[in-house]
């Protein structure tokens, strides 16, 4: 992923820049659903977070959404939308497309800089997000309203979409309760790690040798450490964000044409070209 704040900022800028009045009205009308959609499969990463808890393979499902059957996901998703009319779900799905655009554009840089070391990967993403928020809104990530992206009741239309996709493409059993809990746990974890208490820091220290990852990498630092990336690299990151925003607007318009104007899938599917959320080609 880029982290939550980056995805929210991308989504907000897409709404602002959208020049199709009908689509803009849809996204503004279901703004919270759209912005949660911008978190994509990250929704499942923190299900039942904590050591030794039964996670029912839900976080792994979030990982699989990023790398397995990505084209099939977007094809099956758009077909499902054509058969199951829901503005709530459609807005969420359009946000999911934006998650893909941002991940696809930014992940190659992060993987290269982190040398595929997970702790370094997250440190870089959190520092990039912190700096981007400061530059675009003059706000510190430590003061960001982490509850705002989750402050709504998840529609059953969205849950039922995931249940369908998970079973058909990934042989993963989900339920409405699991999906609602995933959203709740995502929110709780982001709030907890924004200002981690002594308990979290202690548990992070205990967990590190067990999970081979430093949970403190999921915490926004008081200030950025520029050893992780140069100012030139940060400027390239911002350029990649702007490219992802433009890409998102194009794919949103194409998806809208498929669902609302019954256009064929060919142009829409061309946006995915065998590339997963990590920027890796699978064909």
PLM features per residue range, with description:
Residues 1-94, 100-283:
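N-terminal leader/auxiliary helical segments
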């Amino acid at each position: 992923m880029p982290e939550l704040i980056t995805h929210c900022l991308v989504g907000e800028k897409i709404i602002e820049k959208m020049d199709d009045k009908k689509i803009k009205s849809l996204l503004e009308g279901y703004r919270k659903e759209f912005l949660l959609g911008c978190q994509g499969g990250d929704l499942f990463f923190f299900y039942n977070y904590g050591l030794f808890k039964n996670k029912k393979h839900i976080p792994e499902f979030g990982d699989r959404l990023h790398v397995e059957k990505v084209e099939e996901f977007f094809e099956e998703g758009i077909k499902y939308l054509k058969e199951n009319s829901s503005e709530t779900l459609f807005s969420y799905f359009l946000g999911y497309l934006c998650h893909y655009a941002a991940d696809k554009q930014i992940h190659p840089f992060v993987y290269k800089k982190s040398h595929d070391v997970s702790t370094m990967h997250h440190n870089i993403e959190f520092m990039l997000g912190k700096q981007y928020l400061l530059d675009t809104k003059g706000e510190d990530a430590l003061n960001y309203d982490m509850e705002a992206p989750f402050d709504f009741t998840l529609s059953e239309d969205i849950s039922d979409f995931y249940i369908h996709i998970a079973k058909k493409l990934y042989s993963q059993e989900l339920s409405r309760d699991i999906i609602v809990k995933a959203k709740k746990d995502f929110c709780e974890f982001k709030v907890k790690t924004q200002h981690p208490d002594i308990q979290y820091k202690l548990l992070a220290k205990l967990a590190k040798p067990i999970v081979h990852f430093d949970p403190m990498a999921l915490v926004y630092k008081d200030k950025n450490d520029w050893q992780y990336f140069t100012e030139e690299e940060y400027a390239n990151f911002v350029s990649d964000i702007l490219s992802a925003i433009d890409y998102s607007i194009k794919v949103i318009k194409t998806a809208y044409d498929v669902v609302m104007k019954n256009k064929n899938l060919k142009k829409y599917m061309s946006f995915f070209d065998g590339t997963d959320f990590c920027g890796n080609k699978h064909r």
